[in-house]
Amino acid sequence: MNMFIVMMINIILSMSLIIIAFWLPQLNLYTEKANPYECGFDPMSSARLPFSMKFFLVAITFLLFDLEIALLLPLPWAIQIPNIKITMLTAFILVTVLALGLAYEWMQKGLEWTE
């Protein structure tokens, strides 16, 4: 019963936040919000400059390996559970998939800046 109340509160809170997030932007629609802020001066050039795709690939790779660290950090505590084989197999599969993805990106020359 107590778990049901907690789940209902979480669902109601989540749904109310989603509804508010969709409802608030529709209150004040005008074009000034869509333009970049330029401190009152006319923009010298376009404010939306394209960015390097190589930088994007390196940033995504960094995020993936940062996520790997976050997932593997509690591994010493997870080893203390009785069924250690499943925990170690899951960690090994995660590291293997990420290593294969890194090797593929390296083979495709996605990590090289000179081209």
Swiss-Prot record:
Assigned EC number: 7.1.1.2
Transport in keyword set: yes
Group of enzyme by EC: translocase
Topological relation to the membrane, as annotated: Multi-pass membrane protein
Predominant location category: mitochondrion
A GO MF label: NADH dehydrogenase (ubiquinone) activity
Subcellular location: Mitochondrion inner membrane
Catalytic reaction(s) noted: a ubiquinone + NADH + 5 H(+)(in) = a ubiquinol + NAD(+) + 4 H(+)(out)
GO cellular component terms given for this protein: mitochondrial inner membrane; NADH dehydrogenase complex
Oligomeric form and interacting partners: Core subunit of respiratory chain NADH dehydrogenase (Complex I) which is composed of 45 different subunits. Interacts with TMEM186. Interacts with TMEM242.
Entry's family note: Belongs to the complex I subunit 3 family.
Protein name: NADH-ubiquinone oxidoreductase chain 3
Gene: MT-ND3
